């Protein structure tokens, strides 16, 4: 691992990053405002491992180009990432309060896409979360649902897409099979078939996912 790229400063996205950087002398990349917001939680990071990224600007690590794009979330300066290697493109888009034109444009023509499918709306509404937390998740800077993820995929799908990974699933307000079936049904209704040239899998919370080659 040559670098860590941080999307935003929430603790579930930075936990362990500081320890990893110190132990293996690995740089941490984030937007300037994100760095300011997370620096106390990371602990001491040597200056040469404090690195910045800028929205829509390329950051080159060896033979890989990383380009952040803006996302709406309740953080100071959150981003998703596009990762380019040769003609191949991998997109990472989680913690999306809602879908913007920037997100649509950024994840179009990806070979591999990791997309948030955070919750089932009925499970969330009927679940045990307090009202203010439900409102935060459902709000413009919260998280997108299985249905929203499916509709976005149907909208931006191209023949270049090979793998979809659904990620950032809520433990309490979603199930992997429910997220998969909801998204698969929306794609099928849009005449997009899974299982041949296009595959979809879940990004597991506590274990490694499938290894894919493009």
Where do the protein language model's features map onto the residues?
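Active-site environment of divalent metal-dependent phosphoester hydrolases
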Residues: 10-14, 35-38, 75-76, 98-101, ...
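Metallo-beta-lactamase
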Residues: 32-87
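Active-site metal-binding motif and surrounding structural segment of the metallo-beta-lactamase
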Residues: 1-31
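Structural motif
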Residues: 2-3, 88-90, 112, 163
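Divalent metal-coordination and catalytic microenvironments
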Residues: 8, 28, 66, 73, ...
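Short, basic/aromatic-enriched C-terminal tail that caps enzymatic domains
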Residues: 198-214
